[in-house]
A protein has these predicted regions:
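Acidic/histidine-enriched, beta-strand-rich ligand/metal-binding domains
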Residues: 94, 98, 103-108
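Short intrinsically disordered terminal tails
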Residues: 1-4, 105-111
Length: 111
């Protein structure tokens, strides 16, 4: 199966970011695979890119919460890599869940 990039942009997902003096791109996909297995996201240090699938496997859009969770999951893989640790899936998943909850529940005095 072949990865399919999308032309869509999401206002809550950056196109680039810099951490640890490394600039990473974020690419959004209609379809994303690893050895023919569908993926929600992928961190690639060699290419310095995070790839995010923004559609369900049936072609319908994923929710903002699911996309953010996937983005944070892959971002935490980048943190782990730069911290010189293995890509622990459970750690990245836990941090992504906590970050999503933080982002969706925070309230400011002006709101």
């Amino acid at each position: 199966m072949k990865d399919v990039l999308t032309n869509e942009k999401l206002p809550y997902i950056p196109e680039t970011f810099t951490i640890g003096c490394h600039t990473f791109k974020v690419q959004l996909y209609e379809e994303l695979y690893d050895d023919n297995s569908p993926l929600y996201g992928q961190f690639d240090y060699d290419e310095q890119v995070i790839r995010i699938n923004i559609f369900k496997h049936n072609g319908k859009p994923l929710s903002k919460e699911c996309i953010l969770n996937t983005y944070y999951h892959e971002l935490f893989h980048a943190f782990n890599y730069l911290w010189n640790t293995e890509g622990d899936e459970s750690l990245a998943s836990t941090f992504a869940m906590l970050m999503c909850e933080y982002e969706t529940t925070r309230r400011y005095a002006n709101e």
